[in-house]
Regions:
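Structural motif
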Residues: 12, 63-64, 112-115, 141-144
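Short beta-strand elements
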Residues: 1-6, 53-57, 63-72, 148-149
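Active-site "cap" helix and flanking loop/linker of ATP-utilizing ligase/carboxylase catalytic domains
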Residues: 29-43, 48-51, 69-138, 152
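Short beta-strand/turn micro-motifs at beta-sheet edges
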Residues: 1-3, 102-104, 150-157
Length: 158
């Protein structure tokens, strides 16, 4: 079933992605990430930071690059961070010191899903400042992330 809606970056995300096996992860690193970083270095543009590669895996199992960003992807990051058990700040500092390869990254086994709630009409023309009443309360197994929301003068979430 096709979703007929405007397509901003994404309407949701999940982690882990079943298609990203250890073999696929290694393949992406060897065929996409490493050549990208090596290519930047060869052109005198060494890079330290987040390199987000938006990928699609085609029917033949070949990873294809849709986009690169030098930041976390949104909303992809939220489900990923819910699974990260390692200290993100320690990883960032290690990257700055060129010691990221010495860090152990630990993930929990849980599945995490993020769903975007957006105003009617988003991302085109949509009403701003309207009350938001449909966000469920956080529980021990859920977390609410906000983007583009605020409390108005009456403390109503808008």
């Amino acid at each position: 079933m096709a979703i007929k809606a405007p397509t901003p970056a994404a309407w949701g995300a999940y982690s882990p992605a079943p298609i990203v096996t250890d073999e696929m992860s290694l393949r992406v690193m060897q065929e996409i990430i490493r050549p990208t970083v090596d290519g930047m270095a060869a052109e005198g543009a060494s890079y330290t930071g987040f390199l987000y590669a938006g990928l699609m895996i085609d029917a033949a199992g070949t990873p294809k690059v849709l986009e690169y960003n030098c930041r976390f992807g949104d909303p992809e990051t939220q489900p990923i961070m819910m699974r990260l058990q390692s200290d993100l700040v320690a990883h960032c500092l290690a990257a700055l010191e060129q010691k990221l390869d010495q860090q152990l990254t630990i993930w929990n086994d849980k599945v995490s899903v993020g769903v975007v709630l957006a105003a009617n009409g988003y991302p085109d023309q949509y009403a701003k400042g309207e009350a938001i009443n449909s966000i469920p309360a956080e529980t021990s197994s859920s977390k609410v992330f906000h983007a583009g929301t605020r409390f108005d003068s009456t403390q109503q979430l808008v």
